[in-house]
Amino acid sequence: MQKLKQQVFEANMDLPRYGLVTFTWGNVSAIDRERGLVVIKPSGVAYETMKADDMVVVDMSGKVVEGKYRPSSDTATHLELYRRYPSLGGIVHTHSTHATAWAPAGLAIPALGTTHADYFFGDIPCTRGLSEEEVQGEYELNTGKVIIETLGDAEPLHTPGIVVYQHGPFAWGKDAHDAVHNAVVMEEVAKMAWIARSINPQLNHIDSFLMNKHFMRKHGPNAYYGQK
């Protein structure tokens, strides 16, 4: 697990590097599907002092199997998403300013241009709010459930992020670094959408044919963007 712990540590350290977190906010995890184990950031540990060996290993029930710290308070959310979506290899939660701003607004981040379409096939959805019973019960688990309720049976790697109402963004990917990459993009397109709609409040969504072209040339079966 040492290699995965190092990857998760590096991905967590990318959060302050890319300006996605303040203080100890945010967390990144990754899963070893063969062993059924998840590596995740420890709860409340400062990035400045954190080391790879501080990463916490939990099983799919959330039981700590390796590590001296408690795992992230959002661990149950991560585990619920891993259980539901086998294609996920890494998950990240941040409170990055612009993506988080859409959470109290209760709005999806609209697909307005090709930067968005290069990564997200359509709007980045916003979940419904959790009920008082859901919050007072297994809050973090129910956060995962409301994300799944919103995504449904859609391929999560086609929409690799979501805004949880009144909370903030979650993003995911094939591994921990891919998840952070998508979180960075999510922050940028959230900012772009806010600026664009400020300039032109009547701005329409990106044309569907342009959306399809940009997403499929990077992620479709005949993708040709980048090098092989």
Swiss-Prot record:
- Recite the lineage of the species: Bacteria, Pseudomonadati, Pseudomonadota, Gammaproteobacteria, Enterobacterales
Q: Which residues form a coiled coil?
A: none
Name of the protein: L-ribulose-5-phosphate 4-epimerase UlaF
Give the binding site residues for Zn(2+): D74, H93, H95, H167
Q: What GO terms are given for molecular function?
A: aldehyde-lyase activity; L-ribulose-phosphate 4-epimerase activity; zinc ion binding
What upregulates this protein?
Answer: Induced by L-ascorbate. Repressed by UlaR.
Role this protein plays: Catalyzes the isomerization of L-ribulose 5-phosphate to D-xylulose 5-phosphate. Is involved in the anaerobic L-ascorbate utilization.
Cellular compartments per GO CC: cytosol
Q: Is the keyword Hydrolase in the record? A: no
One GO biological process term: pentose catabolic process
Which cysteine residues pair off into disulfide bonds? none
Residue positions annotated to bind substrate are: G26, N27, S43, G44, S72, S73
Q: Specify whether Zinc is a keyword of the entry.
A: yes
